[in-house]
Amino acid sequence: MKQHLPIFKSVAIGVLSMAFAACNLNIPPQDQFSDPDAIKTVSNARSLLASAYLAYPHEEYAFSLLGNDFVPTSLSIKDISSLHLYNWDDREISKLAPTLWQGYYNVIAQCDALLERMQAVETQGQTEGTERQAIIAEAKTLKALSYFQLLRVFAPAYDLNPDAPGIVLKTQLGIEDKPRASIRDVVAMIRRLLTEAVQTPHDPERNGWLSQTAVQYLLADLALYAGDNEAAITYGKSVLGKSNDAYFTPDGINSLWQSNSYPGRIFAFNIHTSYYAGIQSSAREGDYFCLNPQLDYVASDVRRASFVYP
């Protein structure tokens, strides 16, 4: 039997909104952070930021099952939990929803803790001053990304009713008892965070840190989400203006999936396990799910060799 290993996915996360609408909307308790006085140097601040990156939830496989990336195989019945999730079974979704909710808000809490402490960070020389500004920009971007994911997962689509309840917006570090803000207000908060972050020139050599280009990409993505096509084009051009033709060759596309940093990759989380490790039953039998044939690439598409494993 043919085995398919999707290496690239495109899932419209917003389709989960109806299923997750009834989940518990309590903000998780504030995590215990280090003594505020302990964050005095850019090195310590960078370490706390790295912890926030590591806390970011990675449920890409679950999103692919809920989306249209995969279709079942004859082995699907052997992984009944994943099959139930694929079929939008309430029992499985009720397990996933609180994990996502708490996970993204945990990242936001860590970013808030870091941003609160950045005023006390002392710098010596221009290099440390630049690094301090980069850390602040990255923390705001990671916070915005977490809010954006929460919005796409737990709220209705923007174009259905932007004034409908969206998610809870944090305004201070610690526990808060607040109602959900409107989708429109959440988008405004995300846009404000990204607009502040994009002002900081930042082009890290390693792809695991959010760069200024990543902020521009998120601004374009947010504009598309909110139906602001003109803004999406403007920010999209800023990103495309930094590309070159080599990024769109077979070698360039293949480089996106290598472990080393690559200038054609806008951003990638540092992870230690494969997103899709759970799809395989065994090397001999094959996979529980296979790539949706409707998402296949024609032979002339340079992405085919890297995105689909025959």
Go through each PLM region and give its residues.
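Membrane-proximal, proline-rich intrinsically disordered regions
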Residues: 22-66, 304-308
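Conserved, well-structured interaction surfaces
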Residues: 81-153, 199-203
